[in-house]
C-alpha cells in the first residue's frame, strides 16, 4: 500500500481538526511508506507482483521458469492449474516451486522434453483475506526447424524480364527474420528494382545482366534460439538475344526463358498482391503493414493513397523503397480502402486494399485496490473497450461471482460493484475479466476492511532546532482506521493550539511560519479515533542566526606583495561554527602562500593568477552566510633586464651502439650565449613512413652530451638536437646519419575501437589504424572479432586489410556486441586486444510519449510534462525528447496567418520542459517525440492550450491634426500587438510653458473602439505634451508620446492701434514645400507667410516606417535646407515646421532618392519671373518664324516645315485649361495618381520614363547638386542623353520646368 496525502494545509480553529492519514484509494498495495514494524501487524489480501507473459515462448534447451510472485499479510500460499485442472507439483520430480514465491522451475536440462510441458498455466496466491490469480500463461517451446531439402534448377532469363526468387522458410516459433545474402555473407543490394517482400521472397521488377550470379541465398534467423538456417543457393543467369549466335537465336523463343513476361518495355503489373483488390485485418495498437510490388520496364514507382481520407502524417512510414506502407499504432479510425499505384512511362495500374482494424480489450478504467474502515461504503469500477466490445465478468477470490458465497454488503451493477456498510468479513480479492475474440484483460483488486486504533509513527522526544524568524515544522506521522483526528498542545498542561500563527498540514505536521524565541518548548501531538488514542511529545529550540559583522573589502595590490582579507562572524554560542574561504567559488589553491589566521585570509607573494573573487562562508549546523570581495593584481614598475640570446645549435652528431631497439646518440654543444643550457631536445625523422616530418623523441639535461634512445622496429631513423636556455630554443642541428631497425610483430593494437550501426540491421566496427611508425613491419592487417554480449555465441572473426572499418550485416536492431580489433603483420600478431562494447544499428523509435500535459505558467511561458516511453521501444540511444509547437491562430481570431512550427529539444530522459517566448492571448498546439541516434519517433497526439491575455504594445501611431485656438484632434492606430481584448485607452496630457516646465497632468479614459478624439477648451498658443497607451484586462501597455501647439489667438496679433474688424489677421502658413533629391542628398525649400521672428526646423524619415522623425534645426530665417547622408533609391517623408510667438505650423511632403532628381511640381504659374520668361520665349519663337518665312520667300532650301514637323517644340503646344498647369494646387489634385507622360508622378518625383525632360538630363548625371540658396549646380551643363522613343509620345502639356529647360 502506498499512502498518499495531498499537500494541502489548513489553519487550525478552536476544537478538533480531523487529519487524513491514510490509505484512501491505493493505486497499488506494493509500496507502503510506513514503519516496517507497523507492516508486520497490518493484514492485507494477496496481490500478484510479478508473472510470466501471457504468450510465453521458452527455449527448449534451458530449464522452464514460470514466474508468479505475490505479496500479502499473512504471506500467501501458491497453487497452480494446468489446462484448467489442478497441477500437483509434488507428483512430478522435475517440477519445483521457488521458496517464498509461486515461481515454478521445471528441470528439463537433466531429463525430459519441453514439449511435455506445453499448456495453459494459471497461478493462485491465497491467504486468509482472499485469493489473487495470474493471467492464463500459455507455455510453448520455440522451434527452429531445418529447411526441407530441395533441388533448385538454375534460372536463365532475358534482360528486362521480371523474376521472383522464392524463399519459403520453415515455419518456426516465433516466425524467423528473413534476409538474402551471398556466399560471402554480404547482404544483396536492394533498390526500387530489386527488393524483398514481407513474405521473404526476392522480387525483380526487371533483371539486368549484372544480376547474374550463382549464390542467391535466403537466410532465416530464429532469434529465440539464436540460430540461422539457410536455403540452397539459387543460380540466376541473365542474357540478351543479341548475345546468342544467329543459330540459337533463330530457334529460341521467349517462352523457353524463365517466365512468360516480355523483355521489352511494358506497363506495370503487380507481382504481389494479386488481382485488383484484397483485404487486410489488423489489431488496434499494432503496426499495419501494406505491400505492393510491381514489375515492368522501365522500373515502376509505387505511390500510396487512402480513398476516404488522408494518411496519418505522424504515424506513416514508407519502407522498402515505398513498396511497403506502415502505419504505427493503428486505430479504428485507420480502417478504410488504401490504394497503391504502380506507374512507369508506359502506364499505371492500381490495387485497392480494404483494411479493417479490430481491437483486443483495453482498459478505460481498471479496478483499483480499496481499503475501507468498518461501516464505510466504496465501489470497484471495471471499464474496458474493444472491437467487438468486450464482455465484462467478475470473480471473487478466483471463483465466478455468480457461484461465490453471497456478501450482503456488495451489489453488482454491470461493470461496477457497489459496497455499503462493509465489515471485516467483506475483505476479498476481486478479479475483473474483459474479453472478446481477440484477447482478454484480467485485473485483481482487493477490498481490505481494517479496524485499527491510532498509532503515531514519529519517534518520541524528537528535538527540532530552528533559526529564529524561519519556519519550524514539527512532524506527527500517524496511522489508524477509522481516520483519526489530530490535535497539538504546547506545554505539559497547555490547551489545544488554535491561534492563527500555527498551520496544521494534512499529514499531521505542525508548522510555525515564523518561529520566535518564545516558540521554544515541548509540543504534544494527540491522535484519536473511536478505537483509541495515541500521543507523542517533541521539543523545539530556537537559535540565533549567524551573521558577518566585518565583511572582506575590495583590494588592489601590486604583483609580488601581500594582501589580507578580514571576515568577522557572530553566531549562536550553542552551535559549532566553521569558516571556509573560497576563490571564485572553489576551494583555495593548495599553496603555502595562502594562510588563514582566525578572522583573516592572507595571500603572500601575490601573482596575476591570484586575481578573482574571494568569499568567506560561515556555516553552522542550521544556517550559512557568506560575503565576497574582489582582488585585482597590477604590475609593479618594470626594471631593465639584461640582454641574452638563445644557444647556438649543437653539431657533430654521431650514432654508436646500434642495436635492434636502441642506439646511442652523442653531440657537441654550441655556444650558450651568456645563458646556461638547461636541456637538450632530441627529435627524429621517419624517412620510410613520414619523410620530412620531425617528431619529439626525448629530452636530457643540459649537462649531458649523449643519450640512449629507445627505437621502434621497421623505422628508418634520422636524429637532430636543439639546445634550450632561459631565453629560448636554438635552431636544430644538422641531421644525423640514417639508421634502419629490423621488423617485428606489432606491439600495440588499434585505438578508438567503436561499434555503431549505420542501419538497423548492421554493425559498423571502426578503429584508429596504426600509422606506419607503429606497424613494426610490412603487411599490416587487422583481425576483427565480434559476438553478442548477451549470449554464449562464439567469437566471429575476419582479417581485413589496412583499413579503418568493417561492416557486419544481418544483425538484430540495437543489440549490444562485444568487439575487439587486433593488429598483425608479416611477422606475427600484436598482444591480445581489449574488448569494447558497441551496439548494432539504431532504428526509429516506435512509441510516442504518452500523457502529455501542458501547464500554462503565464502569458508567455508554458510548462510541458509527458510520460517517458518504454526503453525497449526507443530502439537506440536516448538523445532526449523534442517538442514541436506552433500557434494556430490568435485567440481573438484577428491574426490567422500561418506560423512556422518551433522546436525545442530536451536532452536525456527529462520528462518536462518549459516553452518560453509564447505570444499572449494565443491558441497553441504541440506534440512531443522521443529522439534517438537514428531520428525522431512518432509524435504524441496534439495537445492544444491557450495563453492568457498580456499587456498590449504601444499604439502604432499617434498624430495631432486640425489644431485650432482651443482644441486639438488626436488620431491613432491601435497597437500592432494587442495581446488581448482592448478595454480602453488612457490619454494623459499637460501644458508646457516657454521655459519648458510641465503643467498639471490631465488623465482621460477613452473607449477602446475609438481611433480619434478631440480635446476642447485648451489654451491658445500653448504647447501640450501627450502620453497615450492602451489597456487590456492584464494591465496597461507601453505608451507613445507626442507634442502639439494650439494656434495663436487672432485677436492677439492685431496692432494695438487697430480695432477689431478693421484689419484681418493673417494666419502663418508654409506652402510650396519642394524636395529636389539626388542619390544621397536632397534640397528642401519652402515659402512662408506670417509673422516674422520664427524658427524653422526640418524633420524627415523613411516613408512607411515606424521609426521616429529625425530633426534638423534651420539656421536663421532661411527657407531652404540640405539633407545629406540619405540612402539611394529610398522614399522619404519630410515636413517643415515653424515655431514662434504666433504658434506652430508645418507642412509635409514625400520624395524619393535615386538617379532621377525628385522635385515636387511648383506652383510658379503666377510668379512674375516665370510670366516674363514665357513672354521672352514667345517673342523668340515669333522672331524665328519671321526669319524662316523671309528665307522661304527668298527661295531658300531650309526645310523649316519638315524640321518643325519632325521635332515639334513642346513649348509651342497649346496648354489646356483643365490640366492645372497654372492653377492652384488642391488637396485632391496632390493625391491623384498621374498617368504615363504626366508632369509629376504620384510620389512627387520627376522620373525619366514619365517626362520628356528632367532636371537630371541637364545636370551631371545623378551628381547634380544645389547651392545653399537652393539654386542648381550644373543644371545647364553637359549634353542631354538620347531618350527612348516613347519619351516624346506624350500629348499632354509640358511642365513649366521642362519648358524652361527646352528653351535653354
From Swiss-Prot:
The chain crosses the membrane at residues 1168-1190. Glycans are attached at residues 83, 223, 245, 251, 276, 314, 433, 507, 619, 716, 802, 858, 993, 1009, 1019, 1072, 1083, 1115. It is a single-pass type I membrane protein. Coiled coil: none annotated. Residues 46-134, 141-235, 267-356, 361-448, 454-541, 545-632 form the Ig-like domain. Disulfide bonds join 68-123, 167-218, 292-340, 382-432, 476-525, 567-616. Residues 1199-1304 are annotated as: Disordered. It is found in: Cell membrane; Cell projection, Axon; Secreted. This is Neuronal cell adhesion molecule. It comes from Homo sapiens (Human).
Amino acid at each position: 500500500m502506498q499512502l498518499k496525502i495531498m499537500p494541502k494545509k489548513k489553519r487550525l480553529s478552536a476544537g478538533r481538526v480531523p487529519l487524513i492519514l491514510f490509505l484512501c484509494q491505493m493505486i497499488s498495495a506494493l509500496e507502503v511508506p510506513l514503519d516496517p514494524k507497523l507492516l508486520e501487524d497490518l493484514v492485507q489480501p494477496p496481490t500478484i507482483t510479478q508473472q510470466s507473459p501471457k504468450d510465453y515462448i521458452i527455449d527448449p534447451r534451458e530449464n522452464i521458469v514460470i514466474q508468479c510472485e505475490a505479496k500479502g499479510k499473512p504471506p500467501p500460499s501458491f497453487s497452480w492449474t494446468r489446462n484448467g485442472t489442478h497441477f500437483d507439483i509434488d507428483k512430478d520430480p522435475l517440477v519445483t516451486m521457488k521458496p517464498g514465491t509461486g515461481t515454478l522451475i521445471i528441470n528439463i536440462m537433466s531429463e525430459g522434453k519441453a514439449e511435455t510441458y506445453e499448456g495453459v498455466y494459471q497461478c493462485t496466491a491465497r491467504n486468509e483475506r482472499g485469493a489473487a490469480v495470474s493471467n492464463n500463461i500459455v507455455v510453448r517451446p520455440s522451434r527452429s526447424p531445418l529447411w526441407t531439402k530441395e533441388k533448385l534448377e538454375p534460372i536463365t532469363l532475358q534482360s528486362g524480364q521480371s523474376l521472383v526468387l522464392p524463399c519459403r522458410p520453415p515455419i518456426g516459433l516465433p516466425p524467423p527474420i528473413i534476409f538474402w545474402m551471398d556466399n560471402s555473407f554480404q547482404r544483396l543490394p536492394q533498390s526500387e528494382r530489386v527488393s524483398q517482400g514481407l513474405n521473404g521472397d526476392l522480387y525483380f521488377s526487371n533483371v539486368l545482366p549484372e544480376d547474374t550470379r550463382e549464390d542467391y541465398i535466403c537466410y532465416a534467423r530464429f532469434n529465440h534460439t539464436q540460430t540461422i538456417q539457410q536455403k540452397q543457393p539459387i543460380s540466376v543467369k541473365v542474357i540478351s538475344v543479341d548475345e546468342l549466335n544467329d543459330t540459337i537465336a533463330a530457334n529460341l523463343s521467349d517462352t523457353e526463358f524463365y517466365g512468360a513476361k516480355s523483355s521489352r518495355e511494358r506497363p506495370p503489373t503487380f507481382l504481389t498482391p494479386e488481382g485488383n483488390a484484397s483485404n487486410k485485418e489488423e489489431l488496434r495498437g499494432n503496426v499495419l503493414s501494406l505491400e505492393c510490388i510491381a514489375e515492368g520496364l522501365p522500373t515502376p514507382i509505387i505511390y500510396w493513397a487512402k480513398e476516404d481520407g488522408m494518411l496519418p502524417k505522424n504515424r506513416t512510414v514508407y519502407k522498402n523503397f515505398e513498396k511497403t506502407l506502415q502505419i504505427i499504432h493503428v486505430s479504428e479510425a485507420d480502417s478504410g480502402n488504401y490504394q497503391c499505384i504502380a506507374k512507369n512511362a508506359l502506364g499505371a495500374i492500381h490495387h485497392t486494399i480494404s483494411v479493417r482494424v479490430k481491437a483486443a480489450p483495453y482498459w478505460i478504467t481498471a479496478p483499483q485496490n480499496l481499503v475501507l474502515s468498518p461501516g464505510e461504503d466504496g465501489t470497484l469500477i471495471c471499464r474496458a473497450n474493444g472491437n467487438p466490445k468486450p464482455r465484462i465478468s467478475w470473480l471473487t477470490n478466483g471463483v465466478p461471482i455468480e457461484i461465490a458465497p453471497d456478501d450482503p454488503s456488495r451489489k453488482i451493477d454491470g461493470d461496477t460493484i457497489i459496497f455499503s456498510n462493509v465489515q471485516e468479513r467483506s475483505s476479498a480479492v476481486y478479479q475483473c475479466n474483459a474479453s472478446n475474440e481477440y484477447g482478454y484483460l484480467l485485473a485483481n483488486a482487493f477490498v481490505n476492511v481494517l479496524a485499527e486504533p491510532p498509532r503515531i509513527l514519529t519517534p518520541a522526544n524528537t528535538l527540532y532546532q530552528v533559526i529564529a524568524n524561519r519556519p519550524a515544522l514539527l512532524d506527527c506521522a500517524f496511522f489508524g482506521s477509522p481516520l483519526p483526528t489530530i490535535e497539538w498542545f504546547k506545554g505539559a498542561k497547555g490547551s489545544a493550539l488554535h491561534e492563527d500563527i500555527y498551520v496544521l498540514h494534512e499529514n499531521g505536521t505542525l508548522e510555525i511560519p515564523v518561529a520566535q524565541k518564545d516558540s521554544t518548548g515541548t509540543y504534544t501531538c494527540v491522535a484519536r479515533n473511536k478505537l483509541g488514542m495515541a500521543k507523542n511529545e517533541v521539543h523545539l529550540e530556537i537559535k540565533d542566526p549567524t551573521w558577518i559583522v566585518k565583511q572582506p573589502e575590495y583590494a588592489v595590490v601590486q604583483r609580488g606583495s601581500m594582501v589580507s582579507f578580514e571576515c568577522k562572524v557572530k553566531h549562536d554560542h550553542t552551535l559549532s561554527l566553521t569558516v571556509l574561504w573560497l576563490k571564485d567559488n572553489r576551494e583555495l589553491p593548495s599553496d603555502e602562500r595562502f594562510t588563514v589566521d582566525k578572522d583573516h585570509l592572507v595571500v603572500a607573494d601575490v601573482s596575476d593568477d591570484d586575481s578573482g573573487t574571494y568569499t568567506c562562508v560561515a556555516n553552522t549546523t542550521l544556517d550559512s552566510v557568506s560575503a565576497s570581495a574582489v582582488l585585482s593584481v597590477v604590475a609593479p614598475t618594470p626594471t631593465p633586464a639584461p640582454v641574452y640570446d638563445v644557444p647556438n645549435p649543437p653539431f657533430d652528431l654521431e650514432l654508436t651502439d646500434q642495436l635492434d631497439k636502441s642506439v646511442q646518440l652523442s653531440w657537441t654543444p654550441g655556444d650558450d650565449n651568456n645563458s646556461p643550457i638547461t636541456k637538450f631536445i632530441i627529435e627524429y625523422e621517419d624517412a620510410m613512413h613520414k619523410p620530412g616530418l620531425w617528431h619529439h623523441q626525448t629530452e636530457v639535461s643540459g649537462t649531458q652530451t649523449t643519450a640512449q634512445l629507445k627505437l621502434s622496429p621497421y623505422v628508418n631513423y634520422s636524429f637532430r638536437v636543439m639546445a634550450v636556455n632561459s631565453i629560448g630554443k636554438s635552431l636544430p642541428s644538422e641531421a644525423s646519419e640514417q639508421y634502419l631497425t629490423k621488423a617485428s610483430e606489432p606491439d600495440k593494437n588499434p585505438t578508438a575501437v567503436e561499434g555503431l550501426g549505420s542501419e538497423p540491421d548492421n554493425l559498423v566496427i571502426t578503429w584508429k589504424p596504426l600509422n606506419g611508425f607503429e606497424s613494426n613491419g610490412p603487411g599490416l592487417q587487422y583481425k576483427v572479432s565480434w559476438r553478442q554480449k548477451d549470449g554464449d555465441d562464439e567469437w566471429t572473426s575476419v582479417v581485413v586489410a589496412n583499413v579503418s572499418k568493417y561492416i557486419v550485416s544481418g544483425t538484430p536492431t540495437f543489440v549490444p556486441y562485444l568487439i575487439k580489433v587486433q593488429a598483425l603483420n608479416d611477422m606475427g600478431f600484436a598482444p591480445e586486444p581489449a574488448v569494447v562494447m558497441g551496439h548494432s544499428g539504431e532504428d526509429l523509435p516506435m512509441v510516442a510519449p504518452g500523457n502529455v500535459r501542458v501547464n500554462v505558467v503565464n502569458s508567455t511561458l508554458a510548462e510541458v510534462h509527458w510520460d517517458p516511453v518504454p526503453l525497449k521501444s526507443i530502439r537506440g540511444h536516448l538523445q532526449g525528447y523534442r517538442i514541436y509547437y506552433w500557434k494556430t491562430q490568435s485567440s481573438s481570431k484577428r491574426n490567422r496567418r500561418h506560423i512556422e512550427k518551433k522546436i525545442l529539444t530536451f536532452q536525456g530522459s527529462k520528462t518536462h520542459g518549459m516553452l518560453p517566448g509564447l505570444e499572449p492571448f494565443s491558441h497553441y498546439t504541440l506534440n512531443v517525440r522521443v529522439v534517438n541516434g537514428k531520428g525522431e519517433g512518432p509524435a504524441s497526439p496534439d495537445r492544444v492550450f491557450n495563453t492568457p491575455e498580456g499587456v498590449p504594445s504601444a499604439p502604432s501611431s499617434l498624430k495631432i491634426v486640425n489644431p485650432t485656438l482651443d482644441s486639438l484632434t488626436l488620431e491613432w492606430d491601435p497597437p500592432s500587438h494587442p495581446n488581448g481584448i482592448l478595454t480602453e485607452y488612457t490619454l494623459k496630457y499637460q501644458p508646457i510653458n516657454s521655459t519648458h516646465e510641465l503643467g498639471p497632468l490631465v488623465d482621460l479614459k477613452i473607449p477602446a473602439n475609438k481611433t480619434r478624439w478631440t480635446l476642447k477648451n485648451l489654451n491658445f498658443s500653448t504647447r501640450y505634451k501627450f502620453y497615450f497607451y492602451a489597456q487590456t484586462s492584464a494591465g496597461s501597455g507601453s505608451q507613445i508620446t507626442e507634442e502639439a501647439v494650439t494656434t495663436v489667438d487672432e485677436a492677439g496679433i492685431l496692432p494695438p492701434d487697430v480695432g477689431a474688424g478693421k484689419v484681418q489677421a493673417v494666419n502663418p502658413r508654409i506652402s510650396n514645400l519642394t524636395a529636389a533629391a539626388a542619390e544621397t542628398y536632397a534640397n528642401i525649400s519652402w515659402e512662408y507667410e506670417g509673422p516674422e521672428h520664427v524658427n524653422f526646423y526640418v524633420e524627415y524619415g523613411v516613408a512607411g516606417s515606424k521609426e521616429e522623425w529625425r530633426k534638423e534645426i534651420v539656421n536663421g530665417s532661411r527657407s531652404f535646407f540640405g539633407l545629406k547622408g540619405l540612402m539611394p533609391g529610398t522614399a522619404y517623408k519630410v515636413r517643415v515646421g515653424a515655431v514662434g510667438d504666433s504658434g506652430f505650423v508645418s507642412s509635409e511632403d514625400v520624395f524619393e532618392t535615386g538617379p532621377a532628381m525628385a522635385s515636387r511640381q511648383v506652383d510658379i504659374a503666377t510668379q512674375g519671373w516665370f510670366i516674363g520668361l514665357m513672354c521672352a520665349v514667345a517673342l523668340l519663337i515669333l522672331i524665328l518664324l519671321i526669319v524662316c518665312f523671309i528665307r522661304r520667300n527668298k527661295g531658300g532650301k531650309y526645310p523649316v516645315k519638315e524640321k518643325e514637323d519632325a521635332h515639334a517644340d513642346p513649348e509651342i503646344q497649346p496648354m489646356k485649361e483643365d490640366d492645372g498647369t497654372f492653377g492652384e494646387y488642391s488637396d485632391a489634385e496632390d493625391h491623384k495618381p498621374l498617368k504615363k507622360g504626366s508632369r509629376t508622378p504620384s510620389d512627387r518625383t520627376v522620373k525619366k520614363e514619365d517626362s520628356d525632360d528632367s532636371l537630371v538630363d541637364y545636370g551631371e548625371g545623378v551628381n547634380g547638386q544645389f547651392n545653399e540658396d537652393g539654386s542648381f549646380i550644373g543644371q545647364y551643363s553637359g549634353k542631354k542623353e538620347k531618350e527612348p522613343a516613347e519619351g516624346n509620345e506624350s500629348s499632354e502639356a509640358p511642365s513649366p520646368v521642362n519648358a524652361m529647360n527646352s528653351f535653354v
